[in-house]
């Protein structure tokens, strides 16, 4: 056995005995879906250590290979699939759940925009991350529109920044789609509606990845994640306190609306339609030179 083989075997042994590391967002859909896995309620799964982070940070953690299981944006997959594989469960896809482009209701142009990207020409725009699905959809939708600046902010700070006038527009995700009117903002574009109208496919937002060097088989990990989601559906009350503990939004009705929108049948299994949606998004983006071509297929044997 070579020294590199000894090192690899030692690392695998340490990983097996140390349990699993999981990195997800603190948003209700993630804490709801992964409550059972994180709390040792899925039989046969070693102890799980959880890290919570904003989606832009999660994408960066995956690029550095820091976690065994990690939630990322589908838009980031072209940079991640050499070290990770896509699991067919636990992610966020759906219909009517896309990112929104928001502006102040006080702006005369906002009321007349109705999905016209030209309203953003010369605008200062806040986004949740450069490798997020939200920003990739934004770039496809607003192709040819020259904005003034693009700045990355933690998603929970985008609406206050637009409200305060520091930005002309904000690209929002998560529970922001339920609460933006309270900030005096209006939606000038629903990028999910735009995507569904253009493709007929669901919106591929967040993916769950597993490290390729894990000793567990990918099928076993997918089954464990699927079991966690199924447990959440079977007993929603079990995760309620943990979900509220980590949520940016504490209103129970908003939290429940968030879960209802983002945790669905695609969270149990991507299926043919889920894979087709992700492939279509990344193929369109690669054609426009917005992302590299995928290094390998999303669906692996």
Predicted features by range, described:
Residues 21, 84-91, 124-125:
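A structural signal for short loop-to-beta-strand junctions that line the ligand-binding cleft
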Residues 153-245:
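Pocket-lining segment of extracytoplasmic ligand-binding domains
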Residues 86-113, 196-213:
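Hydrophobic/proline-rich hinge and linker segments of small-molecule sensing/allosteric domains
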Residues 62-63, 162-163, 285:
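Hydrophobic residues within well-ordered alpha-helices
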Residues 14-39, 53, 99-169, 175, ...:
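Bilobed "Venus flytrap"/periplasmic-binding protein-like clamshell domains
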Residues 43-57:
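A short beta-strand-loop structural module common to alpha/beta enzyme folds
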Residues 29, 54-56, 65-78, 154-155, ...:
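Beta->alpha turn/N-cap motifs
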Residues 215-284:
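Secondary-structure end/capping motifs
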């Amino acid at each position: 056995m070579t020294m590199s083989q000894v090192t690899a075997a030692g690392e695998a042994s340490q990983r097996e005995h140390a349990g699993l590391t999981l990195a997800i967002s603190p948003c209700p859909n993630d804490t709801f879906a992964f409550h059972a896995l994180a709390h040792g309620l899925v039989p046969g799964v070693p102890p799980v250590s959880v890290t919570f982070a904003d989606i832009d940070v999660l994408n960066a953690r995956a690029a550095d290979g820091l976690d065994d299981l990690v939630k990322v944006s589908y838009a980031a997959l072209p940079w991640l699939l050499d070290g990770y594989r896509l699991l067919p469960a636990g992610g966020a896809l759906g219909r009517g759940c896309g990112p929104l482009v928001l502006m102040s209701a006080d702006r005369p142009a906002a009321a007349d925009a109705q999905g016209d990207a030209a309203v953003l020409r010369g605008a200062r725009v806040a986004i949740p991350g450069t490798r997020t699905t939200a920003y990739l959809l934004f770039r496809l939708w607003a192709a040819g529109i020259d904005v003034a600046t693009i700045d990355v902010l933690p998603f929970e700070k985008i609406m206050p920044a637009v409200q305060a006038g520091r930005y002309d527009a904000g690209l929002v995700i998560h529970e922001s789609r339920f609460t933006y009117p309270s900030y005096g903002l209006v939606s000038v574009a629903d990028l999910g509606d735009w995507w569904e109208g253009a493709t007929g496919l669901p919106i591929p937002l967040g993916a769950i990845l597993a490290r390729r060097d894990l000793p567990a088989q990918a099928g076993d990990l997918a089954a464990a994640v699927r079991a966690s989601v199924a447990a959440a559906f079977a007993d929603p009350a079990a995760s309620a306190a943990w979900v509220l503990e980590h949520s940016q939004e504490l209103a129970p009705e908003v939290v429940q609306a968030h879960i209802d929108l983002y945790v669905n049948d695609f969270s149990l299994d991507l299926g043919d339609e889920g894979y087709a949606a992700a492939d279509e998004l990344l193929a369109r983006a690669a054609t426009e030179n917005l992302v590299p071509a995928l290094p390998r297929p999303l669906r692996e044997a």
